[in-house]
Amino acid sequence: MVSKPFQRPFSLATRLTFFISLATIAAFFAFAWIMIHSVKVHFAEQDINDLKEISATLERVLNHPDETQARRLMTLEDIVSGYSNVLISLADSQGKTVYHSPGAPDIREFTRDAIPDKDAQGGEVYLLSGPTMMMPGHGHGHMEHSNWRMINLPVGPLVDGKPIYTLYIALSIDFHLHYINDLMNKLIMTASVISILIVFIVLLAVHKGHAPIRSVSRQIQNITSKDLDVRLDPQTVPIELEQLVLSFNHMIERIEDVFTRQSNFSADIAHEIRTPITNLITQTEIALSQSRSQKELEDVLYSNLEELTRMAKMVSDMLFLAQADNNQLIPEKKMLNLADEVGKVFDFFEALAEDRGVELRFVGDKCQVAGDPLMLRRALSNLLSNALRYTPTGETIVVRCQTVDHLVQVIVENPGTPIAPEHLPRLFDRFYRVDPSRQRKGEGSGIGLAIVKSIVVAHKGTVAVTSDARGTRFVITLPA
């Protein structure tokens, strides 16, 4: 199957220029059409008024009952000679022409090709193509006339209730047609020039209008990894670009946060790994510096094994967090009773709690959730391990389970020294410690709470922490 070649969309400047120019040119042509149509209607009304005026004059002569036909025709010829660009034809009741304009063909011969005049408002008015003849023009000497506007009407004394004549009057409209054609040609020429000007003006206007976009683009191009704290000012751009600038600022803020976290993460993990590696090297060098007994070598190996185990756990935890960061942490959900899961975690920590003189207590109902049992037990284990680490001897750690508004909450409470408010938002950050100096006395690697948050988020839940004089409370909220 042959794929279609990639075709880049037209630029915004091209599209804007095309549509604005098209709209403007269309508006101009619409105006030109209205003008031409108005002129045509005006000329048609003017011609019809002239025809009615002529017909009224001739009708008075032909309707006179006391005149003979010869006398009527003589009077008719005298009147017609006073009109230029007008042809007359008079037919009797038998359809025979009794008079037509001297020196001109009989217009009745051309009436079979007559068509109704659509520009005439009311009345039976027709357009004729022919006869062709030279006649005086409007200030232009003689000109060829071949297009006529014609009316016909019954006139003359009544015989058997019907007029004895039918009068045909044709008025030349060639001057009007020439005027309209000249006007159309001038409008077309003007439209062509204006269209070209409009395209260039719109191109210039669009180029000027896109200046803020180019300005924003230059500002964005100047932002490097060292300038992630730079923000664009939405007040300095047009309102149409404000949302774009705000979105960019939000994006760069997220990038800065991720970049900062990654930098800190790299520094922290390098520091965390460097210390056990240094210990391994130091212990090994000391062991090799002189002859050692088997017991001393075994002690060194056990110490090295402890450091290696700690490093392996840290690497495993980091891989787990990397999966969470890449949305690859997919829980294998099944219906669980959280009371049972808490009991299993209690069984695991029971010996350690007794050794430290701390009591473990569960309070609550049998809360049902859909979740991954291994992940949830790991999250609970990390919270309980953290609570055991900071709970004074003789105190009690309480784990509560409750259902609130179709949500299940697991609360881990432990008494102890309260955590300062400024530290609470960062407790779930990797390698973050409230007291950085306490790194090696059983406090762990500093990523346990980060793992808790990743597991809870993977289950579409939330985790929060509060701390006061009564102790510290971690609250996991999961969908029921």
From Swiss-Prot:
Q: Which organism is it from?
A: Escherichia coli (strain K12)
SUPFAM superfamilies listed in its UniProt record: ATPase domain of HSP90 chaperone/DNA topoisomerase II/histidine kinase (SSF55874), Homodimeric domain of signal transducing histidine kinase (SSF47384)
Q: Which gene encodes it?
A: cusS
Concerning Pfam families, the annotation shows: CusS, HAMP, HATPase_c, HisKA
Under InterPro entries, the record lists: CusS-like_sensor (IPR048590), CztS_silS_copS (IPR006290), HAMP_dom (IPR003660), HATPase_C_sf (IPR036890), His_kinase_dom (IPR005467), HisK_dim/P_dom (IPR003661), HisK_dim/P_sf (IPR036097), Sig_transdc_His_kin-like_C (IPR004358)
Q: Which PANTHER family match?
A: SENSOR HISTIDINE KINASE CUSS, SENSOR HISTIDINE KINASE YKOH
Protein name (record): Sensor histidine kinase CusS
Misc. comment: The cus system plays an important role in copper tolerance under anaerobic growth and, under extreme copper stress, in aerobic growth.
- Give the Cytoplasmic compartment stretches of this protein: 1-15, 208-480
